[in-house]
A protein has these predicted regions:
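Iron-sulfur-associated redox domains of electron-transfer enzymes in respiratory
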Residues: 1-169
Length: 169
């Protein structure tokens, strides 16, 4: 019996429609389980960061979303380190997508806008604590601007036949 390929799926900053498109090809996924194992996918499997830390190697990582926070960056770096192949899935991962439009505005305008519209209202802040939120990066980046990417599957979301071809490759 040949060893099953380990597949990871991760979504950074984006709308998660690319992940939904992957999940929507369920009628083909049953054949996938004969030769592949979904080893990390927070959206579908409820995987935690500790699950990723325990894995020695991943054969293929499908990374969706743009890099907008320090946690997005950390995930991209860790998944690249563990993955034999890194695939930028969708327009956000491939090009920055809609989240990347924020790069068109001066950063001070975006900072002021965020500070004005995000009044303190969390339970943590009511207790005098700071919420543990990821830090926003100065600019939104596409995946290839952070790590080496082996393949790009663009689209918003990518077409299902392209998704299935990428999975089978």
């Amino acid at each position: 019996v040949p060893k099953k390929k380990k597949i990871a799926v991760y979504s950074a900053t984006g709308c998660r429609v690319c992940e939904q498109a992957l999940a929507d090809i369920h009628y083909q996924v049953s054949s996938l389980t004969r030769w592949a194992e979904l080893s990390f996918w927070p959206y579908l499997l409820g995987s935690q960061w500790s699950d990723l830390e325990r894995q020695a190697e991943i054969d293929v990582c499908f990374f969706t979303g743009a890099i907008k926070t320090d946690s997005d960056r950390q995930a991209a770096l860790k998944l690249r380190e563990k993955s034999r192949l890194m695939i930028a899935l969708g327009a956000c991962a491939a090009f920055g997508g809609l989240p990347g439009l924020v790069n068109l505005a001066p950063s001070e305008v975006m900072k002021e806008s965020g500070e004005e519209t995000n009044a303190p209202n969390s339970r943590a802040q009511e207790k005098g604590e700071e919420p543990d939120l990821p830090q926003i990066e100065e600019r939104v980046s596409a995946l290839h601007q952070i790590v080496e990417v082996d393949y790009f599957v663009p689209g918003c979301p990518p077409r299902q036949n392209f998704l299935w071809a990428a999975i089978q490759a």
